[in-house]
Amino acid sequence: MKYDFKVSDKKWQDIWEEQGAFHASSDKTKPKFYGLVEFPYPSGAGMHVGHIKAYSGMEVICRKKRMQGYNVLFPIGFDAFGLPTENYAIKNNMHPREVTDKNITHFKQQLKRVGFSFDWTRTVDTTEESYYKWTQWIFRKMFDHGLVFRDKTLVNYCPSCKVVLSNEDSQGGKCDICHSDVVQKSKDVWYLRITEYADKLLEGLDTVDYPANIRMQQENWIGRSTGAFVNFSISGTDEKLRIYTTRPDTLFGVTFMVMAPEHPLIDKYADRISNMDAVTDYRAECAKKTEFERTQLVKDKTGVCLNGLSAINPITGKEIPIYISDYVMMGYGTGAIMAVPAHDERDYDFAKKFGIDIVEVIKGGDISKEAYTGDGEMINSGFLNGFTNKKDSIERMLEYLSEQGIGEKGVQYKMKDWAFNRQRYWGEPIPIVHCPKCGMVGVPYEELPLRLPDVKNFEPGEGGESPLAKIESFVNCKCPKCGGDAKRETDTMPQWAGSSWYFLRYIDAHNDKVFADPEELKYWLPVDWYNGGMEHVTRHLIYSRFWHRFLYDIGEVPTAEPYAKRSAQGMVLGANGVKMSKSLGNVVDPNDVVDQYGADTLRTYVLFMGDYGSAAPWSDTSVKGCRRFLDRTAALTDMIKGTGVT
């Protein structure tokens, strides 16, 4: 008889559910396998075939491991806090809770129709109080251990979403959520000191099985560099302008300095700067620009010389001008740089525009035409003259800096501390109380979760303040430390919070005493294999490794790294080879494929599209080919069983 996928799909999916066929066992004598996929954000659009490809690979691995006798944990959940849901709720006059529940129901229906072997008894939802209680608990632990701080600073701000964005969430000068232009705004920001874990995150990569491209992206994101901190005296003062450089060997070629327009020394010595009006105007222009706009390499170089303020090159003793320019940022390095125009393209362009001296210190190019950025013999460099090995010349300069007390070897990171707050409603409330007497005080652990109040108006204020700031019953409270009048923090956590530890909650999803039982953690950790998208191998993967390593350091988890192995599937493109998009009308709904060809056909096709790690276009013709293959397989099975099908 002909293979009837509708009958077969329902039959086996019902049997699996009735028998709890995919529930992880409590038998810890069996070898374990923890297979993890990135849990989805339950958007109103529902799942797309990209989700199916992401999950189908791990699905095959987990089914094989079960056949081999492993105790398999293959869970699923929903990363449900976040701005898209809130924006949709505002637009459609609904509550985010209602939107979230509706979307999760739809996602569950889709996932079950495809027949994935998830353990549904361990499903988590990051918006449930029983879950975000422990998200807040981990934040409190970080606060107690000095990894949380608050600072007023210029931030990336989305006027459309009315929310502060991290650098990671505003790449290209665009909001990662709504894609509108980002502006700079001064705000109080909560930060997590992820930079304190930079070396541990790098060292941890030596202990895990990550593909070379994923490891490289993580290393580049953290961006560890070794160089030197050097002090340049400001002429006529006792002040030192401290810079960081990875090329201390080129100090003889420094002919000017550049400071960030926000540098505090500008205001400190304003009375010495004769063109302060021009400086003030330029600073005002810079304040309107986003970080992306300020740091683009291809843009025209702009700046203003600080007339009346100059620096002394500590190696040559020569007086050199100080400029301010928008491409130098206070949040990077020290907020000032030394400029070696002969051997840096950006410095070269700047020097040419402003008529600044260019001194060649590395032989090999023609500096009358362009900067020379290669290696070569050191020239015009005093005690370094004749050196041809860059490493040797750097080491000799480091020795000299130390001997003279004008600098020292140092390390810097490209990664910055993690901006960790949003001025929106649909997120985890930050469990901090502000007391006039005691300062910032953590909400007591026994009072967690700090619940998100149920409100009717959850739109942010025009000034960008959180909707929670308008709820007096939430804001006004007593200080947990002194008992005096205090106010609760009204910002919420970013969407990245809940996804930074969800793999731990799967292990013991219903425990209300701890986020997971230590014995369960000991058995199941680390995750044996984690598969997800390449778009998450920096932010999410680094953030979750950071949270896990912190929990390891305070004795809450038994492993230093959360994931033993990581892989990434390629994107499923539209039939025209372009990324699937509603606006382009090339999105494929998995429900449509299941209706027409069956769940097995869909899962088979996404596994045979090509190299699993590469992008591939959708092909209806190939889907039909997979259906014919399964028809022949079913016919062969029937023939072997003697049912007469030929």
Briefly describe each language-model feature range.
Residues 182-184, 194, 252-281, 377-380:
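Nucleotide/phosphate-binding sheet-loop regions of phosphoryl- and nucleotidyl-transfer enzymes
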Residues 1-36, 66-75, 99-106, 282-323, ...:
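Conserved oxyanion/phosphate-binding beta-strand-loop segments in alpha/beta enzyme cores
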Residues 42-73, 175, 332-362, 427-436, ...:
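Conserved active-site neighborhood of enzyme catalytic/cofactor-binding cores
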Residues 2, 15-19, 91-241, 248, ...:
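Residue patterns forming the tRNA-binding/recognition surfaces of aminoacyl-tRNA synthetases
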Residues 58-59, 71, 263-366:
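Catalytic alpha/beta core of large soluble enzyme barrels
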Residues 25-94, 100, 123-138, 245-246, ...:
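N-terminal catalytic cores of NTP/NDP-binding nucleotidyl/phosphoryl-transfer enzymes
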Residues 231-235, 312-314, 573:
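A generic structural motif
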Residues 20-25, 70-71, 114-119, 145-148, ...:
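Surface-exposed helix-capping loop/turn segments at secondary-structure junctions
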